[in-house]
């Protein structure tokens, strides 16, 4: 299961993002901002593009997570950002229903706290 965090902000300048050659979706700037917030505490890869937006991998307590980001422009240069936290699981774990993503997942809670404490983020929702 993927955990999703949605919020609105004008903190990021999407015009400075690299082009996503697969699909013109923004999201890179959120991942770069998160990388700065982490301060090398965790192995967080350089953002790369995908057809649904941008992603980085993070190694958290020996497990890999995909951190995905995308951005949708609403009205008046207000942007809705979507942050996805995806826990990678082995085939064995999937078959036997082990190591599922939960509300108490430490990696999810870490990113949740970062997002919740940023004063420029509004309309924060968790799915």
Question: What label would you give each PLM region?
Answer:
Residues 99-127:
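Intrinsically disordered, low-complexity regulatory regions enriched in serine/threonine/proline
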Residues 52-103, 107:
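Amphipathic protein-protein interaction modules
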Residues 41-55, 117-127:
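Short glycine-rich, low-complexity/disordered patches
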Residues 29-30, 124:
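Short hotspots in intrinsically disordered terminal tails
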Residues 2-4, 31, 76-80:
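A general secondary-structure signal for short beta-strands and their flanking turns/coil
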């Amino acid at each position: 299961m993927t955990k999703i965090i949605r919020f609105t902000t004008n903190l990021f300048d999407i015009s400075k993002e690299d082009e996503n050659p697969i699909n013109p979706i923004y999201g890179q700037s959120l991942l770069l901002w998160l990388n700065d917030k982490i301060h090398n505490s965790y192995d967080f890869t350089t953002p790369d593009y995908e057809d649904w937006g941008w992603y980085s991998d993070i190694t958290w307590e020996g497990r890999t997570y995909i951190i995905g980001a995308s951005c949708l422009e609403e009205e008046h240069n207000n942007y809705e950002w979507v942050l996805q936290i995806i826990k990678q699981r082995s085939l064995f774990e999937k078959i036997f229903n082990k190591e599922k993503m939960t509300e108490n997942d430490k990696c999810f809670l870490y990113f949740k706290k970062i997002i919740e404490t940023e004063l420029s983020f509004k309309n924060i929702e968790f799915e």
